C-alpha cells in the first residue's frame, strides 16, 4: 500500500539455506508490503539505494521479503499482540531492533575468505544457542510470520531481550558508506522508535566510528540506546569476537537506560562520538582515548551512570537529515605548500577540520597559511582546530595555538577527527542558525563529544558519612555500595512528596537518578503517578528517560494517565513520551473508561496521544459502549475525536444501529449529523 492508498508490487525472494547460505529460488510479487520511499534528495553519486529485507516464515519455508521500517512496526505489533495472549514470561521482555548494514560480523567463510551473503546472518543466528533461545521463540512466537530471536536469560539482568533483524540490500563494505546511508539508518530508527526499547546497528569496522559520530548528532533528544557494533571475525566462526560483541550490544540495548549512540566492542561500551579505530587486526580494535568507557563487561556489568550524557532539552526525539557535504580535513605537515592549502579552502568549501600539531599548534613562521585561513574564515568558512594526537586537547594558551584562535579558528577541545567532521556537517546543515549561532554550537558540548569546564563540584550528603560510621563501613567500595542502596529510594521519595530541592541536593551528591526500585520504577514514574508537576518538570530537565518501563510494562506517561494528571501528561508528551501498548489493550481500557463514565480518563488518554478508535476483543470501539450505555456527553466527545458511528463490531452492529435498536433518538440524531474527519490520535508513524 502506498501513501495514496494504491497497491504497489514489492519483490519478495523465496530463499533456501544451501551450502552457500541463502540463495534466491524465484521472484514473486506481493501487494502486502509497503515500499520504502526516500524523503530526502540523494546527493552522493556513490550512494546505492537500499531496501530492507526481513526473514518471513511460511509453511513452505523461509522467505527474504522486502519491507519498510513502517511495515515492520505493524508486523511486530501483531507479534506483540499474540505474545501477550500466551503464557506470561518469567521475565519482562525488552524488544530490540537490529539493523544489519554489512561488515565482517555477518560474513560467510568461503574458500578461506570472508564474503557477504544475503540472508546468511539472519539464518545462521537461529542455530547459535547463546544468541537464540529456540525453545522460547517456538513457544511464544511460532505462529508469527516475522519471527524474532531471543537471548537466553542473562544473570542479573531484569529483562529478557527479544530482537528482530532486518538486513539492508545491498550489504555494504563500510568503506562504501555515505551520508545518505547514515540518513537512511537514522530515519529507519525514527520510524520504528516507539515500538522498540533499543536499537543495534551491525556495521563494518573501517568507518564504524564515522557512522557512530554522525548518528549521535543527527539523532536529537535521543531517549533510547543505539548501539553500533561489528567484529574482526564473523559471528558464525568457531573463534569469533562477533558473537560476544553482538550479545553485549543486545544486552546493553535491551536492559540499560543509556540514551546515547554508543559503540560496543571487546567488552567495552564507549560513547560513539568519542571512539576511534586503533587496530586493524586486534580484537580490541576500538578505543575511546579521552574518555573512560561508559560500561565494561567483566564477571559483572559495571555501568558508569555518572558518565552518561543526557540532554537537558525537553523535546521529542527527532532526526536532523540535512548534513552539509562541503566539508574536509586539512592535515598540517612540515613544508606543505601554500598552493595546496589555498586550493583546499576554495569554494564550495564551507567547513574545515584543521588537524594541527600537539595541543593545537601551528607553525608561526607560516604566515602565508595563516593568512589563507583568515581569508577563508572572513568569507564564512568554519575552521575547527583538532590535534593530530589521539590523547589530549587543544590548548590556546600556547602562542602557536593562540595565533589560530585570534584569527577565528574554533578550538575543538579533545574531539576526535571523526566526531569533529560529523559535528561540522550537522551544525552547517542547520539552516535556521545564523553564523554566530553556528560558531557557538561548534564550541558547545552537544552530545558529550568534547570535554568542557564543569560548573561546580559534586558534594557528599552529610548522612552518608554518618551512616558509614554507624555501620562500621570503611572501604571506599563499601561506602559507594551504601550510597547506591540509600540514595535512589530517597530520590524516589522526594519525587513522591514533590520536594524538588531535596532532589537537587541528592543529584549534586552524585545520586544515580535513573536507578529503579524493586518494581523497576524510576523517580519519574513516582512523580507522574502522584501528579507532581514540579517534580516531573525537574526530572525531565535533567534528562530522565520518558521511555523506561517498570515491571508492569508502564512508562511514566501511562502512570500520568492512570493518575489523570493532565499537566504531567502534557509535560511528558512534550519530552517525547509515547504509549506503545497493544491496540487491543488500549481498546479495552477505553471501553472500560466509558463503562465507568470517566470522561476525565478519556480526555487524559486523548491528551496522551492514544488512538481513540482502538477496538476491544469484540472489535467494539468506545463509541459502541457509550451508545449502549446511553451516555450522550461521552458520545458527543468521541464523535469530536473522530470515531465513526458506522464502524461495525464482530456482530455486525454499528453505534448508529445500536441507537436505533434501543430507540435512543437523541443519540441517533447526534450521530446522523456526523461528518467523517481524520481520526485524532498521537500516532507518529506514517505509511511511507
Residue ranges and their predicted role:
Residues 90-93, 99, 120-140, 149-157, ...:
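Accessory alpha-helical/coil subdomains and C-terminal extensions
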